[in-house]
C-alpha cells in the first residue's frame, strides 16, 4: 500500500489524482490540503479518511472541525499547516497540485523530509529550480513531473543518457485564441479565454494557455527538470493535443509520447513510476485521426514564450518576476480589471523595472514576488 499526501486536493489536478486513487486499491491518502473549498474538502475527507487535513484559513479550519467532529482527524491551517500536510510522516509521495508560489515552501520542506514529489506546481521550478533540483539530488528524492508535456519528455528519455539529448520539443495546443492576430485580441473576454479547445483545466492555467505564458513557464521548468540549456528547448504548436511532447537525440532520432488529452495518464505515471498501470480512458484511433498538425507559434502576437526565454537567459530573480507579474495580471484579467493584452504589458513593465538578484534565496524569491505585486498596485493606483 502506497501512502500519498496531496496539497491542492480540491483543484483540477487534485480531484483527478483522487480519481486515480479511487480506481486503484493500493494507494491510501494519508494527508490532504486545500484552499478554501471546505464543502468539497469535507466530501473528500469523508470518502478517503486521511489522518491530517489542511485548509488555508483558520476560520475555514474551525468550520471543518465542526463538520467533521465525528472523525479523529487533525485539522490544521495556514502555511505551517500546509507544510505539516506536505511532510506528513506516513506519506511516501507528495502531489503538489496547488497553484502559485504558495507551493514552494511545502515542496522544499517535503524534499527535506525525504518525500518524492509528483510535481504539478510549475511555479516551484520556475522561480526556485536552482534550489529545488540540487536539494532533491542531495536528499535522494525523485521529482516526477505531472504536467502532460514534461511527463511526455520524462517518458521519452527513460533509459536514455541525458547527454545524448539534442533538443526538447514542447507542444502547445495554441489555446483558445490560436490563429488570432493582435487586433483581434483587443476585445476578447474572460469567457472567451476560458474556452480551451481540448483540455479541462483550472481558470488560471486556461488563461495562461491562451496567452502562451503557460508554454513559457514550461520552457523554464523543462530547463531545470532535464538539465538542458534554453537553446535546446523549442515550442511547437500541435492543436489536436495528441502529441504531448517530443525529444530529439544526438543521432537525429525523435521520440514522441502520444495520447488523448487526459491528465489522468501523467498523474498515474508519476504515482506509480516506473511501473505502468492500466488506465480506463479513451485511446487513440489512428485510422480516424487523419493528419497530425504541427506548426510554429506566433510569438509576435503571443509574447509569453519570448518573455520566458528572456527571463531564463537573464536568470537570477527574473523568472520570479515573470511568474509573479503573470499571476497578478491573470488575477486582474479574471476579475475584469484589465483587458487580455494588458497581461503582456504588465509582465513586460515589471521585467524592465526589476533590478536582478543573482542566485536568489527563498527569502529573495518571496521578496521579489512582493515587489512585483506592490509595483503593479502602485502603477494602477497612480
Where in this protein do the model-derived segments appear?
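Catalytic, metal-anchored helix/loop core of enzyme active sites in primary metabolism
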Residues: 1-382
